């Protein structure tokens, strides 16, 4: 392509971009569409030298239009710090699926007790941040006291040497949970060993299947830092997981996979068909490492499947110290 024509093309697009950014209208994408139609496209010879193509214009303009389009679209809950709105019964985790309830009970889900929302976020894959599912992490209402009973001043001075005496025990514990990945893993694992019951609600934002959901769980569990020290025991647990997750077929967007961590460390899997509002208990994994490693990965460490869910959950846990 001729350098002069390329330069003119880019200048025209730059002028269009600048004009739309300065437009009093809040929708820069609409501004771009109006102005781009008035720009006269320049023809460029293709490789055959016999056919003319508009592809350079379309390539550059598509990139520009895409950036303006996504600039105007609201982003839901990607970096929220005010995680839990007051006076509501649910919260939007992703705009493409139903809101998540702040409370889950045995009246509306196949669970053993009442759970309160602890943290939430989205699961992304690849560097393009391709969204896979919305995730809600819940803590059993009757187990909230286990947080302060386990992570207290005695625990702090027993296991950690780098305590800042100018800070309160709660401030020191909060610092370790939020800023030290290795120590946060130890603290969360100790919390889970206390018998703390938890629940994960996974809601796909696009159609998927049970195989992909199971593979995702196995990958998450396998990234726990203590896997190498527990290979044989964990292998048996993953075999149990495969049996409990034996259902095949598709999972529609907005259906739910409910994973409940029971007091004895077992995991119960349930499936919610949101279209027909039907529930199915799929199976139970009794191997305690599977549940412990899964929820530990959700709550801490470098390789959490949803950093936003981890952050909001840890922030909430700190308020319970």
Curated annotation (Swiss-Prot):
Record family assignment: Belongs to the AIM18/AIM46 family.
Pfam families tied to this protein: Chalcone_2 (PF16035)
Claim: Mitochondrion is one of the keywords in the record: yes
Gene disruption: observed consequences: Increases frequency of mitochondrial genome loss.
Residues of the transit peptide: 1-72
Keywords from the UniProt entry: Mitochondrion, Transit peptide
SUPFAM superfamilies (UniProt xref): Chalcone isomerase
Matches recorded under InterPro entries: Chalcone_isomerase (IPR016087), Chalcone_isomerase_3-sand (IPR016088), Chalcone_isomerase_sf (IPR036298)
Note: Present with 1350 molecules/cell in log phase SD medium.
GO cellular component: mitochondrial inner membrane; mitochondrion
Protein name, as recorded: Altered inheritance of mitochondria protein 18, mitochondrial
Molecular function terms from GO: heme binding; intramolecular lyase activity
Gene3D superfamilies xrefs: 3.50.70.10
Compartments reported by the entry: Mitochondrion
């Amino acid at each position: 392509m001729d350098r002069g024509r390329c330069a003119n093309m880019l200048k025209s697009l730059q002028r269009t971009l600048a004009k739309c950014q300065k437009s009093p209208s809040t929708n820069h994408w609409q501004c771009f569409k109006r102005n781009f139609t008035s720009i006269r496209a320049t023809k460029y010879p293709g490789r055959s030298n016999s056919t003319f193509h508009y592809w350079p214009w379309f390539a550059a303009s598509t990139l520009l239009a895409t950036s303006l389009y996504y600039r105007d679209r609201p982003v839901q809950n990607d970096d929220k710090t005010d995680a839990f709105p007051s006076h509501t019964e649910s919260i939007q985790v992703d705009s493409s699926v139903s809101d998540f309830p702040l409370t889950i009970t045995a009246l509306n889900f196949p669970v053993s007790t009442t759970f309160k929302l602890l943290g939430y976020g989205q699961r992304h894959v690849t560097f393009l941040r391709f969204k896979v599912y919305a995730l809600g992490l819940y803590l059993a209402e009757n187990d909230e006291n286990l947080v302060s009973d386990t992570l207290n001043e005695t625990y702090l001075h027993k296991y950690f040497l780098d305590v800042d005496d100018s800070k309160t025990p709660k401030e020191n514990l909060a610092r370790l949970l939020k800023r030290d990945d290795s120590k946060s893993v130890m603290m969360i694992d100790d919390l889970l060993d206390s018998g703390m019951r938890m629940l994960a609600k996974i809601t796909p934002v696009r159609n998927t299947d049970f195989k992909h959901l199971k593979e995702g769980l196995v990958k998450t569990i396998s990234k726990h830092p203590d896997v190498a020290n527990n290979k044989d025991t964990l292998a048996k647990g993953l075999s149990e997981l495969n049996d409990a997750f034996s259902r095949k077929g598709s999972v529609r967007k907005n259906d739910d996979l409910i994973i409940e961590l029971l007091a004895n460390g077992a995991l119960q899997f349930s499936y919610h068909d949101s279209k027909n509002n039907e529930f199915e208990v799929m199976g139970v994994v009794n191997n305690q490492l599977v549940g412990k490693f899964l929820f530990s990965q959700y709550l801490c460490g470098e390789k959490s499947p949803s950093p936003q869910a981890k952050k909001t959950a840890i922030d909430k846990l700190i308020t319970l110290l």
